[in-house]
Amino acid sequence: MSGLTLVGSGWHPAIFRSEAEALVGPVGFVHPRVVVTTSTDEIALNRLSRSALVDEVLCKAEHSEVVEPENIIQRIVDWGKENLPEGSFAVRVNVIGSSLAGFSRSEIAQNVGAGVFGEAHPVDLENPDNEIVVFLAGPEDPPNHPDPLYLSPPKIIWGLKLKSWQRSGWGGRSPMERPYFQPVSLEPRLARLMISLGHRSDSEPTTVIDPFCGTGGIAIEAMLAELNVLARDLDPKMVKGTEENLQWVSEDLCSGYSATWDVQESGVGLTPDVWGKISGAIFAFDPPYGRNAWKSDDGYQLFLKACSAARTIDHSGSLCTLLPTDPAILKDNSDEPIDYLVMGKPWSKVADEMLDRGWEVVLIAPVKVHKSLARLLVVAHPSH
């Protein structure tokens, strides 16, 4: 296997690319929603199965600038004759971004299928042995989230669907489907994203720690990623609710997994005393904040305590958090940095105070909540 091509979600292409790099190391850029990696081992595939924003994984893939449809079809046919394993096949054609003028999904599928078809390669649209997947990757629509690469030129990508890669869907565990629900619950995709962004190429994670577990959204996704869970909350109702949700997950959704979990009722400053030293920790949390969200520093000191406690528990772990910020950040496509308020403080001050506690920020990305609130997704690694 020479390499893999990863196709990502259109929800936040910039974070998709960051997530891919966190999971498999350096990636090559093809399109805002398509990257390539040379990592193909079992560890890489296992990490990719934990992703939030990777939608498809292709092997033996190629890509091209947009040329005449007939030329593209012939290139895919020639490639298919050389790379398609023996057995039945189907051709799937997808559009990401804006549609490409002059290209028809059905015509590409039919003509590629007809060109590759043969005794060793019968067509089976229902249950094929192999799938040729084509992506017509048009220009990205103006994004909801800032992306410096969204004006990149369109591409056409094709390859074999990697049968050994699977990622669980999001059905069956939305906040309202869990035994214990509160309106503050984090959606599964965002919770999973925080975990995957906590991966690093120089170490393998073992445990996800959430010092503000709420209803257990992050803890649930950690268990489904087959990572151990340590969670705490000061509110006994939340602790009981998280335990109820994790028991449900362990019995109904991941009964065959070996991941363990523990939920404690304690203040964030006591976290090191509760669990001691941990190796391979991802600290993933959504800290509580006041009613005025990004304009208020309510909860700021609690956040800093969590940063200090995390460094004490695992001095070589990683940290990923969501902090309330000014929604104007979502419209910022300028090259000049603006010191937006985050939890009532200028972002530069927040980053400096994290550094004082041993955490160097390596990634920030705004995430839209609604028109009056955004959150800043922050990833930090040990500063020394």
Where are the regions a protein language model picked out?
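Short secondary-structure capping/turn segments at boundaries of alpha-helices and beta-strands
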Residues: 24-26, 78-79, 120
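Short secondary-structure capping/junction motifs at helix and strand boundaries
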Residues: 88-90, 116-128
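Short, charge-rich binding segments
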Residues: 79-84, 123-125, 148-150
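Conserved AdoMet
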Residues: 38-83
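A gly/proline- and charged-residue-enriched helix-loop-helix capping module
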Residues: 102-120
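Class I S-adenosyl-L-methionine-dependent methyltransferase catalytic core
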Residues: 1-53, 97-103, 107, 128-384
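Phosphate-coordination loops involved in phosphoryl transfer and adenosine-cofactor binding
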Residues: 85-88, 205
